[in-house]
A protein has these predicted regions:
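Short, intrinsically disordered, charge-balanced linker/junction segments flanking boundaries
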Residues: 219-227
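Structured secondary-structure scaffolds
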Residues: 1-162, 173-202, 212-220
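Beta-rich accessory regions
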Residues: 206-210
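Gly/Thr-rich phosphate-binding loop signature of adenosyl cofactor/nucleotide-binding cores
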Residues: 168, 172
Length: 227
């Protein structure tokens, strides 16, 4: 076990390893763990043990994925049924989506999704569900849509010609999509990056595609659905 008789940790080690480059967490992480980690780090900074005021060079917070609300008034047809739900569940009955909890039976098991649609579909949908930092509602229909997109990419292989490079007809959409996906990944806009890929695939089905088009298409979704 390493020992240091001169301080809580090595000054050289702290200079090398700190601060954390990027810390990400949900809202509960932000209001609980982050509060204490910053408090202790600022204390250590005040007594001269660490060299930065903040423990993290960059901080982001992702949104929560909600589940369907089984007690939502929109699930019933008569006013009497709606009034009964409001009387029993209050304002919660007015929200179509709520936090996933076992007692409501609205928890989505990732293993079930992977078994039904594959891991690539699961990863792609989580990135496509909405803006990184905002709340989003899980949708089984949207999961199926992501699976259809991956199937369309797979089926494009049958339409690839033996010509190399990129045709003049497809060059604009290919280069535009490469830039869009690159920029969006850098700014955590995964959903709009994937939307651009959907558009490009539609163009390929309309215009036909060469080997160069298909190679570009297979590279761009790699962060979401590795080949």
């Amino acid at each position: 076990v390493p020992k240091n008789d001169h301080g809580p940790f090595s000054h050289e080690g702290e200079q090398y390893w700190g601060p954390v480059n990027w810390d990400n967490g949900g809202m509960e992480h932000t209001t609980l763990h982050l509060l204490y980690s910053r408090f202790w780090h600022k204390f250590l900074y005040d007594i001269g043990v660490v060299h930065t005021k903040e423990p993290y060079a960059k901080r982001t917070s992702h949104g929560m994925i909600l589940g369907q609300n089984p007690h939502y008034v929109g699930n019933v047809s008569t006013q009497e049924e709606k009034d009964a739900l409001i009387a029993k569940y209050g304002n919660q009955a007015l929200r179509p989506a709520v936090k996933m909890v076992k007692t409501l039976g609205n928890v989505v098991n990732p293993d079930d999704v992977v078994k039904a649609y594959g891991a690539d579909t699961m990863r792609l949908y989580i990135m496509f569900i909405g803006d990184f930092e905002k709340v989003a509602t899980w949708s089984d229909d949207a999961v199926k849509g992501c699976k259809r997109f991956l199937d369309r990419v797979w089926n494009l292989a049958d339409q690839v010609t033996e010509e190399d490079g990129v045709s003049e007809k497809n060059a604009p959409i290919v280069h535009k999509t490469i830039k869009k996906v690159t920029d969006d990944i850098d700014t955590l806009k995964m959903n709009t990056a994937i939307a651009a890929l959907l558009t490009m695939v539609n163009e390929f089905y309309s215009n036909g595609l060469r080997r160069g088009h298909f190679e570009a298409l297979l590279r761009m979704p790699s962060p979401f659905a590795p080949p």
